[in-house]
């Protein structure tokens, strides 16, 4: 699936506004194994994140964090898909997932993170995404962020440890303007159009891309719309301000999967 030949359209910003696009790479992130959980883990197997933290929302420096409600999927020894029985309750740099099922036949298992709207190894990249405040990627989980990993059993702790490899592509938008008139405007929507299909359902395939894994499938849509407005009554109900004369993520940084 090609994700790099985008034609960018800004629906709510005049063409004279400066726009800097930064591509965040889908790099491997290390994971930290200091996540805590209060769930009774009897009969469950721990799949832990190692060091330093790996996650599912992205900071401006490319680091990721797990978010509330994130879950992973693993096939057990009987070949049945199992979803983690617990999930983070808030933003955290690390977490210990507890998996139902039996995991004694092998020393390593494939781990799948299909996003919050995905299922098993099926990922849905949303054609309509919403970011309610500047410089946050808390919407990534419902927009199509995803990843796979190989979890390997630790001989000492007997827990499975893994490093999540994110497989989606990300766009970072940094709009600014030197036009005083436009400083009274707000960024409310960004539209990205590609000559390839970039939305709909894809499969996390750990054997693709010479064994490193990849999203496979053809998709079914060529446009993604990112709405950049908060809820009514919130600070950003009118959109993100365009008061900056140079790129400033804190003012109006926007992110798209």
Protein language model regions, located:
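Sec-type signal peptide cleavage vicinity
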Residues: 2-257
């Amino acid at each position: 699936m090609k994700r790099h030949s985008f034609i960018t359209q800004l629906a709510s910003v005049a063409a004279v506004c400066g726009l800097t696009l930064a591509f965040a790479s889908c790099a491997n992130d290390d994971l930290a194994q200091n996540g805590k959980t209060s769930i009774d883990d009897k009969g469950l197997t721990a799949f832990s994140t190692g060091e330093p933290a790996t996650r599912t929302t992205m900071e401006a420096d490319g680091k990721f964090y797990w978010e509330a409600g994130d879950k992973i999927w693993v096939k057990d020894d009987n070949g049945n898909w199992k979803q983690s029985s617990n999930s983070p309750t808030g933003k955290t740099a690390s977490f210990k997932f507890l998996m139902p099922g039996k995991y004694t036949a092998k020393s390593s298992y494939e781990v799948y993170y299909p996003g919050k709207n995905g299922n098993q190894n099926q990922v849905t990249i949303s054609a309509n995404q919403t970011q309610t405040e500047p410089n946050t990627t808390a919407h990534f989980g419902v927009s199509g962020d995803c990843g796979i990993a190989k979890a390997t059993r630790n001989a000492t702790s007997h827990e499975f440890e893994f490093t999540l490899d994110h497989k989606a592509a990300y766009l970072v938008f940094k709009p600014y303007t030197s036009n005083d008139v436009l400083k009274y405007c707000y960024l409310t929507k960004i539209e990205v159009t590609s000559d390839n299909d970039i939305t709909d359902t894809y499969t996390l395939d750990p054997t693709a891309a010479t064994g490193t894994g990849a999203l496979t499938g053809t998709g079914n849509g060529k446009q993604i719309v990112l709405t950049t407005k908060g809820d009514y009554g919130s600070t950003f109900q009118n959109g993100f301000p365009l008061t900056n004369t140079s790129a400033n993520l804190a003012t109006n940084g926007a992110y798209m999967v």
